[in-house]
Amino acid sequence: PYTTLFRSYICRSGDTHYRIPIANILYFVSDRRQVACVTAGREYTFYGKLDTVAAEVGADFVRIHQRYLVRTGAVDRMEGGEVVLRDGRRLPVSRSCQPSALLAFTRAELEG
């Protein structure tokens, strides 16, 4: 992780290090020991833990499920047990994460 005026997330996939602007990241999804950083045009897969990623990216992201960490600015709306991203993708929201997710989305809307 790396912070500058233009905040970015640095991840390593194999021998390659990628600098991904925070504003381009839609969400992170974990599957076992692998985490995928998903942008509009690409997925970057690396080994890690979602809890570690959450600590590194900070308050712009909220945990919506055991496997998903979403950038609040990428969310269009919350419907039932899902969030709908601005590009139409739907991600599950666990019942235990709904209150904190709703609060984070509301805060992002008020501050944005």
Feature locations, PLM:
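Conserved binding/recognition cores within well-folded domains
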Residues: 1-93
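C-terminal output/interaction extensions
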Residues: 100-112
